[in-house]
Structures are given as C-alpha cells and as structure tokens.
A protein has these predicted regions:
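Nucleotide-sugar-dependent
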Residues: 272-292, 296, 303-311
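Nucleotide-activated donor-binding/catalytic signature segment of Leloir-type glycosyltransferases, i.e.
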Residues: 240-264, 268-269
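Short beta-strand->alpha-helix junction loop in the catalytic core
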Residues: 168-169, 178, 184-194, 240, ...
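Short N-terminal targeting/anchoring amphipathic segment
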Residues: 76-97, 109-114
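Membrane-proximal helix-turn-helix segments that form the acceptor-binding/catalytic region
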Residues: 102-105, 127-162
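Conserved acidic donor-binding segment of nucleotide-sugar-dependent glycosyltransferases
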Residues: 315-326, 333-340
Length: 380
C-alpha cells in the first residue's frame, strides 16, 4: 500500500474514500507505464490508496487470475471498513487480468476504467499465456467467440464508467457500450529532460515503441527506401531488437532513462505509420502514447491520418498525412529540413506540455470520482 503524498497542490479537500488501482505492472507494456504517472497524480486526492499490479499482455496464467481476484476482494474488504471505495482499472486489448478482475468486482463499490483500445475494452479476453504462445490457438478461440466476447464485455462493464483518451475513442465506446457512462479525457504528456532544439539535432527520424503489429515497424524497409539517403532512421523500443536488420537503419532495442533521452535527441521527428485495423477483428482507436512521449521531449510527430491521429493533429505538434509511405516520407523530409516549420511545431508542443500535463489530465477522473462518492454518501 503506497502512502498518499500531496505533490500537486498545497491544500485541497480530499475525496472521502479509498482508491484502488488495478493495472499491468510497470515495464510490462505501455499501459503499465502509463498507469504509474497517472496514478501518482491521482493519489493525493484520496486519503488511502492501494494497488494490484498484474502481469502484462501474454504474461498471465489462469491461476494468476484467481489469485488476483482474491487479492482484489481482500483489498476491497479492508478498504470498505474505512469508508467508500473507488476501484480504477486500466484496460487494453491484450491485458486480460484487469478485465477479469473488473468482471468479478463487487457492484457495491464505484468502478471506473480507462479504455486504451476503443471501441472494445479487451479484444481477446481469453488470451492467457498458454493461449498467447500459440497463434493458431489464440485466433481459434477468439474468432469464433467474437459475438460472445462482445456480450461478455457489455455484461462485465455494465456498472462501470469508462474513460477514453480521445473524443473519437469516446464516441466509439458509447456506440459499443450504450449502457455505460462514457467520458472523454486526454493522454498526458509526461515530464522529461529538456533537449537541444530540434533543428540542431542530426538529420534523422525515429520509430519508437513496442514492436507490435500495426505500429509501423513492418513498413520499415519501404520507409527507408522512400526517404532520401541523407536522412538516417533510428528505431528503438521493446522488442525492436528482434527486427531483421535493414541497411541505413539503426536498431537500438529497448531504451530507458538516459538512453531514452539520447535516442530522442538523435532525431528530429518521430514517425507513426500506424494501421491498427484487423480484417478479422476490426479497427482499434488507441490514443498514441508514443506521440505523448515524443511531445515530452519536444519532438514533432508525423503519422498516417487514421485512428485518433487526425484528431490529435488538430491540437498541434503532429502532422497527419494520407495512409501512404511515399506521402509520409515526402512530408517528413519537408518538415525536418525546414527550420521555421520545426520551430513552429516546437512552439505548439510547448503549449501541449502545459495543457496536457498529468496534473491537468487527471482532473476529469477526479471530478467523476468525487461526484460518484458524494452521490453514494447522499443515498445512504
């Protein structure tokens, strides 16, 4: 149990309840890392805080689910002795443990969830590690059971308020879960080291993030060929060390701490040639944690105009282009060789760093939790 520490404002009325977080572990994927900064900003609003950290995508056994559920029930029981209880879940496509803990959560507590991959909460609810290790088994289970899975999600989330990290994501969630209250929030821009101005960095672009399907790494050869030879390409992120070598591309693998600072200072822009559409399962609408990471380092972003990137481009710091590698390469070269354009985007990013700080982004969640706790107390 972490002790709440007020690190945001000097004085504020706290919400009279315990907050319990259910999320994947730190370093198990982007959602677990996101939860660490997010919950640190939320803790000071509560007098008591507990957390249950689970295995990440593909790293949860069936027995783990029973253990986590028993742990959550025990934490809720202890917290209820001290007053109201709010349980917040971080849900994503392949993080099955938080979903199954939510499905078994007591209806007598207030539940909320950040849904990272709208329009569904968990796309593959049976993807425990034994299933994740066998692609044929994964699809053999989930494809035939899509309709049942959809109904299971609607039942599990029926008493839960859902948050999406974009407006387009919130609209899609409302269509999928018409019985749920859905609220729109934003992905925060974390605080990172100040780097040199973008135009003073090497003439290079970066691809960053977990090397998962749909994240653009499969377009690396095509992208390298489309960019002028004087533009270097640098790739970093968990799992990228397993990518096949490509001439003219530096592949770094995972970078943490000072290594991450060095990576971002070695590129003038981050590219997001994302395509999160599956012909079998449909289109995902995640907010880009990689874009927020790039903004933290004052780095412009260019990507395909798909999913949530078109909406994000309206806020600045990001340019969305048609879903063409050739078009992305042309626009990227124009931007990274134009000092005035880079300075304009840097200025926009500076505003985003202030407007989408974690302290501000957490406020819609805090407002809902306060309202829900007050309503429960009033109805007693």
């Amino acid at each position: 149990m972490r002790e709440p520490k007020d690190t945001i404002d000097a004085v504020r009325p706290q919400i009279p309840a315990s907050l319990i977080l259910v999320a994947p572990r730190v370093n198990s994927g982007g959602v677990g890392d996101y939860a660490e900064d997010f919950i640190a900003a939320a803790i000071p609003y509560f007098p008591r805080f507990r957390e249950i950290r689970t295995g990440g995508p593909g790293d949860v056994r069936l027995l783990d689910l029973f253990r986590y559920r028993a742990q959550l029930a025990a934490e809720i029981e202890k917290a209820a002795l001290e007053g109201g209880v709010v349980v917040h879940f971080e849900l994503s496509a392949a993080s099955v443990a938080p979903f199954w803990l939510l499905a078994g959560c007591s209806p007598h507590v207030i539940t909320s969830a950040t849904v990272h991959d709208p329009p569904r909460a968990v796309w593959w609810p049976f993807r425990v590690n034994a299933v994740a290790m066998r692609k044929w088994l994964h699809h053999g289970i989930h494809l035939p059971l899509r309709l049942m899975s959809n109904g299971l999600e609607q039942w599990a989330l029926r008493n839960t308020t859902l948050f999406a990290l974009s407006n387009v994501g919130a609209r899609s969630l409302q269509d999928t879960f018409p019985g749920c209250r859905v609220l729109s929030a934003r992905h925060f821009v974390p605080t990172k080291a100040a780097l040199k101005p973008v135009f003073d960095r090497p003439l290079a672009i970066g691809l960053y993030g977990h090397a998962a399907k749909g994240k653009g790494f499969e377009r690396l050869v095509e992208l390298r060929a489309a960019l002028p030879a004087d533009v270097h390409v640098v790739v970093a992120g968990r799992g990228t060390e397993r990518l096949p070598p490509v001439p003219g591309v530096s592949i770094l693998g995972a970078v943490e701490g000072p290594e991450e600072d060095v990576f971002f200072e070695s590129v003038r822009a981050i590219l997001l040639p994302y395509d999160k559409t599956s012909r079998f399962y449909g289109k995902m609408l995640p907010a880009s944690g990689v874009a927020s990471r790039a903004f933290a380092y004052g780095t412009p972003v260019l990507g395909f105009d798909s999913g949530t990137l078109g909406e994000a481009a309206k806020a600045g710091g990001l340019i969305a282009v048609p879903n063409s590698v050739q078009e992305l390469a042309r626009e990227t070269y124009r931007v990274i060789t134009d000092q005035a354009e880079l300075e304009r985007m840097e200025s926009e990013i500076g505003e985003l760093q202030k407007e989408q700080s974690v302290r501000k982004v957490v406020m819609p969640f805090v407002s809902f939790w306060r309202e829900a706790v007050d309503e429960r107390q009033h109805n007693k």
